[in-house]
């Protein structure tokens, strides 16, 4: 048993090395024209005929009458093992040469090998230099040129000598290639040919990228190829298996690709006389064409030319399917912006200010990046970093996104949807256990599930008010005594959601005005909080007017850590805060007009929608203590700030105090699906206990604790805090490492265009200097900067004159550094305008 165990450990360590290398390699944003069809050629397993299919498609495309000099096919083989004795690009090259002679249609053909391992290069008899990665750049090219003829370009990008899986070949031949390098080389080759094709309106170009082995075969880094090529999300052709057992293998391969978000235009396989196409067509419900090729001759001496001639009708049908699918895709993408403006009612959007050309068409997402379609840019796809974290919800990198997709698929297949009251099922139970052992550890004992952050707040308010009434004996009062007014104490600038109760619990703002909410009255005591920010390289405190006389004494901090230092509790400022809060709470103690402060609700540390302001944590901590001394239940609204958004799993670790009730959503599920929870103490739960159902908490949603959301949340909670999966977790396991480059942060905070900076955890925000007319939520002052950042591949959406960049808990600091570098450069241009 010992040798087996050691082998397994070595395998796991090697796998982790591969995975770490993939995750730490940040892929530069790509830019791919879509005006010519480009397809990935997949197969359900190795040796099923991918290269035969590529050759047949090439012949059908190039060897047609009448031929055209503007017709070109690019065949890329990114990863080739067994080279040079085995070369798929050479096979396509030689067969097209023979087929062109057979059909008497001249074509220009070339075959190039760009890089190989040293053993592979030596097998070619080449004397080459070896790079640090162990790969050699080759000047290997074979070509036959015919002027004015269609053109075939075959390119092998990376080759190894051993006829084994690429990850083993790379390891054994000491010649590694990072995933990002493979993708960048594919992009470069595709763009070179496509941009040449754009110059001629009559050009006709088809690009094939043939994978190695099966759908889930590893690439040279160990990353599965279905994950390796996912950033491009090119449509695919799946070469299935016509043999006994091939139905299962083909379906498994198809499902693996669909689960990762690939589109498959057709399935094609060799006929083995088992009629596999019938059950496959039935399974695919005619959504995807299933094409059958004649049996391939088994005689090694057969040059297959007659087989290609016999298969011509199938390959023509396949080619036409590919061309049509690409046209339909482009037609849909080109029409989406216009149609969206006609049928959508976007939230937080003045439609009169949105022009069709400014609508962002999102084709897909991979990790932190959108794939954006631009019809005006040669019908191209380009990547943009989602600096809004899709409105503050997103956390996954590409690896975690695929993991969550699998978890969601499994749970949907197992449970569909089941109702929650008086029921238990594994995803909900596991999620609740993880919540109580994580963000609720040390204080919470109950988990109440709901749909989104705002509904979680509604539930929290009901919980808090009931607890307050029980503690102050209002529940047993006479009918006359029950005519009391229960309000909240909250901070100006906080935002707790769009539902009616949540809006009542926040101070007047653009979100609560008469045009937005005619019922709004503002049922609370709303206080102006002290805020902290970075400016000119120093952390400063901004005190409300009521504290203005002490501003000079408490103006700056040496570091952000000092702001959160618990030793500040013994400071003079803490005593001033306490006296100020005690005075206001006493004035609204309920003596007058039967009004009572029945709950405290705060966004801990950061006011998000209110402008990304950092509230002095000392002030919030003192406020919590003052309310607790008066038996006023405390609600933490961690919908935005929870689950590592601010660098810790829960802001209780930053504030140094705990609530009675807390709300979580957004990053709870990694941002993949809506789900919210309201956590509460035993004492809060007990305030709803009684013999009558009328004393229970009568609030719920049809999708409360939906299995898919709970399973996704459980996976996200575990993933974010595990150092093996999230390499940003520090050795203590309680905080994220610093993601934003300190020197760049300091430089930006000192920029003449910048009023203030807030940086913590996954959040970087700045307020642009602007006069009163250009400040606030309705301001369009940042529009030109927004446009420049999107040109740089950064998708951001401002809060008036506040610009923010938001990454995920797993985002590489190198990516964050690149974002800040681009922002700093654009700030200079913005300032000049």
From Swiss-Prot:
This is Bifunctional dethiobiotin synthetase/7,8-diamino-pelargonic acid aminotransferase, mitochondrial. It comes from the Eukaryota. Changing residue 382 to Y: Reduced substrate channeling leading to slower 7,8-diamino-pelargonic acid aminotransferase + dethiobiotin synthetase activities. In the N-terminal section; belongs to the dethiobiotin synthetase family. In the C-terminal section; belongs to the class-III pyridoxal-phosphate-dependent aminotransferase family. BioA subfamily. (8S)-8-amino-7-oxononanoate binds at residues 391-392, 495, 666, 700, 797. It catalyses: (7R,8S)-7,8-diammoniononanoate + CO2 + ATP = (4R,5S)-dethiobiotin + ADP + phosphate + 3 H(+); (8S)-8-amino-7-oxononanoate + S-adenosyl-L-methionine = S-adenosyl-4-methylsulfanyl-2-oxobutanoate + (7R,8S)-7,8-diammoniononanoate. The record marks 348 as: Participates in the substrate recognition with KAPA and in a stacking interaction with the adenine ring of SAM. One of its GO terms (molecular function) is protein homodimerization activity. It comes from Arabidopsis thaliana. It holds the Pfam family Aminotran_3. Homodimer. Its cofactor is Mg(2+); pyridoxal 5'-phosphate.
